[in-house]
Amino acid sequence: MKFLIIDGYPEKSRLQFDTVGMTLAGKLYEKMLFQHIPDAETTILYASDNSTLLPNLEVLKTFDGILWPGCNLTVYHDDDERVQRMIEIVDLAFEAGIPQFGSCWAAQIAVYVAGGKVALNPKGREMGVARKIYLTDTGKSHPMYEGKPPVFDGFISHDDEITVMPEGATILASNDFTSIQAVDVAYKNGSFWATQYHPEYDLKEMARLIVARADKLTSEGYFNSQDDMMNYINILETIANEPNRKDLRWMAGIDDDLLKDNIRQLEFVNWLKFEMLNDK
């Protein structure tokens, strides 16, 4: 099966991720895909780069599915050519009926292209771990959440949120910080399943992302100092390397829904099962 992975992070952001030792967003999705379909064929498209040629409709149709990692652009910045390039891809994929899946920015761009709205979350940034995500009544019976606990935590990093859902879209999950944590968007000839949180992240990658966002997080009051931040990072990375550290897991509030791939990645696995392998 052939998958197109759209990494929308600008080159400057990708270089920063390299500097802090974080895996690039497109590569993270590729890694997650290979865990479940080892022989998958992948193409990673760096869509924000001016040198990258966008696929037309006929090229898109050569792919079985399209994957959307997170991105640090803003979907409602209509004057940003990089955003418009990716809006065009989403719309073409809907038109072609190619199944799409993604996280964070993916949920926002799926809703936005279908006619919904996205805005800055008045509560500010939801960072690190999204606590007590719960399935809506629709989510409890949706195939994306087959086998998922009704309440769980997820890795997260965003300050925008979906505010208005378009016709043909459903809310699958929510929490107290962000009312729309997962969506199923049916539009034109296609569907797009997406989470606001990140099934593809693990504890190490989230720790590295916090390092990449160090200045913002400190200025926004998440840490009193860089030293406080590094103490927290050390706890997270120790848990990643020693997952049986009960003391540190208790201190940081890290449970199996964050540590175990078979729980954390279940939304993606179910998308593969029901949308790609047609187990309907």
Predicted regions and their residues:
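Pocket-forming structural segment of enzyme catalytic cores
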Residues: 8, 116-209
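A glycine-centered loop/beta-turn motif at secondary-structure junctions
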Residues: 180-226, 232-241, 245, 253
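Structural motif
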Residues: 58, 93, 102, 163-164, ...
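Cysteine-nucleophile active-site neighborhood
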Residues: 71-139
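N-terminal beta1-alpha1 cap of cysteine-dependent amidohydrolase-like domains
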Residues: 1-96, 220-280
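A structural signal for short, well-ordered beta-strand segments and their strand-loop junctions
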Residues: 5, 42-44, 101-103, 173, ...
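Short, glycine/charged-enriched secondary-structure capping and boundary segments
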Residues: 18-21, 80-83, 114-118, 169-170, ...
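Short glycine-/acidic-enriched loop or helix-start segments at secondary-structure transitions
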Residues: 15-16, 77-79, 111-113, 166, ...
